[in-house]
Amino acid sequence: MPRANEIKKGMVLNYNGKLLIVKDIDIQSPSARGAATLYKMRFSDVRTGQKVEERFKGDDILDTITLTRRFVDFSYVDGNEYVFMDKEDYTPYTFTKDQIEEELLFMPEGGMPDMQVLTWDGQLLALELPQTVDLEIVETAPGIKGASASARSKPATLSTGVVIQVPEYLSAGEKIRVHIAERRYMGRAE
């Protein structure tokens, strides 16, 4: 089992009975001699999506696990269940609407490329989306000419129903690229 100073972003830990994906690591070096370096790690709970923060000393032993990641395509909706199909062996993976509520906010009709399901020991854990998605603005205040010089923003409703802040010069009908985790406008879609 690795020490805390060997943990990298994207690894999965089994800690206090929870499966946690490492999202970010801050290294804090103490100024006093002999004091241990601290590793402040931010996690996302694989099962609940809840954000968790923990501190470890560099020589703390941590229990890492290996998740199986499979690329999937969205297949169909059956009542309250969303079915995804493995791209290689066509295994169906089923999630309830509650399990993937956050992901559905960014998933265009028909799905999107590079979606993955995470499994561990045969147990379905989570649906993972790519970092960005291209969506169309369906409703926002009209674009203001000459507003590109200002950094002001306005709310915009996207084709999936999610509302994010966009620059003032954008108008309805334009396709934009959105950073999913941060719910942030990144630029116009190509």
Curated annotation (Swiss-Prot):
Protein family per UniProt: Belongs to the elongation factor P family.
Pfam families: EFP, EFP_N, Elong-fact-P_C
InterPro entries per UniProt: Elong-fact-P_C, NA-bd_OB-fold, Rib_uL2_dom2, Transl_elong_fac_P/YeiP, Transl_elong_KOW-like, Transl_elong_p-like_YeiP, Transl_elong_P/YeiP_cen, Transl_elong_P/YeiP_CS
Name by which UniProt lists this protein: Elongation factor P-like protein
Alphabetical list of SMART domains matching this protein: EFP (SM01185), Elong-fact-P_C (SM00841)
A single GO BP: peptide biosynthetic process
Molecular function terms from GO: translation elongation factor activity
SUPFAM superfamilies: Nucleic acid-binding proteins, Translation proteins SH3-like domain
PANTHER family the record matches: ELONGATION FACTOR P, TRANSLATION ELONGATION FACTOR KOW-LIKE DOMAIN-CONTAINING PROTEIN
Highest taxon in the source lineage: Bacteria
HAMAP family, sorted: EFP
GO cellular component: cytosol
PROSITE patterns: EFP
